[in-house]
Amino acid sequence: MEISTLEKTLQIVSRYVIITLSISIMTIGVYFFKFPNNFVFGGVTGGAALVAKLTPLSASAFSSCANILLLILGWIFLGRDFAISTGWATVVMTAELALFEKYVPLSGPLSDQPMLDLVFAIALPAIASALLFNVGASSGGTDVVALILKKYTHMKNTGEALFITDLAMVLAACFVFDLYTALYSFVGLTVKSLVVDAVLEQMKMCKAILIICDDKDPICDFVMRKLVRGATYTPCYGAYTDRPHYMIYTTLTHRERSEEHTSELQSPVSIS
């Protein structure tokens, strides 16, 4: 069943809202917690921290140049839609970094507790990355390289691909910054990779749903049009009443199975 133009438009708008919010979360983690502590978990932002330390070039300028080059690779190997959404993410992140540098300049870390800063420097970008991957986008940079590796090699986990692509940047931190910063960065990279996989796994987790109903048409229509999911149905009979029913089988995420969605159904149903 075809999806209407309005529904397609709403899906696209929703996707780009998620991308924009995810990038904002990532930028806050990177600018306020990662850059001031010289944490290098890899990626273009990690390279930006190294470049900003060694040269007069700003982090935002380096990020712009590197992301453009990697975006071209994304277009070639991962497709047009991925490149466009990642390009939007790159533009938003570059703009937000430039705004923070101009209006909220930092002379040092926000706190005197590196471990506390490390928690936020890991958690915010990792959660944001998982949200981006879940909608078929990325923040650009070495995330693009990681997704190319995952697509064209035998790697099954996004976190594993991220770890491999970002490891070189962390090793470089050993020579640019002090040993403690390098150790913090290595711990951060490892935990970030695990968090990305954990969040992605949770978001993609689906449950098999059996729906017993008398009228299959509105429910199948709802599942296919509103939730954009497939469904299979078969006639069945109640063991106690011997009345005929339909049993519909589908898979839904926790959000899709929530009361907010199922309450829209008008037909009496039994969901298990």
Predicted regions mapped to residue ranges:
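Intrinsic disorder/low-complexity segments
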Residues: M1, V228, S267-S270
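Core subunits and conserved enzymes of cellular information-processing
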Residues: E2-D215
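Cytosolic, membrane-proximal regulatory domains of ion/volume homeostasis and mechanosensation machinery
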Residues: Q11, K192, V196, L200-I209, ...
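Single conserved hydrophobic/aromatic residue that forms the stacking wall/gate
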Residues: E260-S272
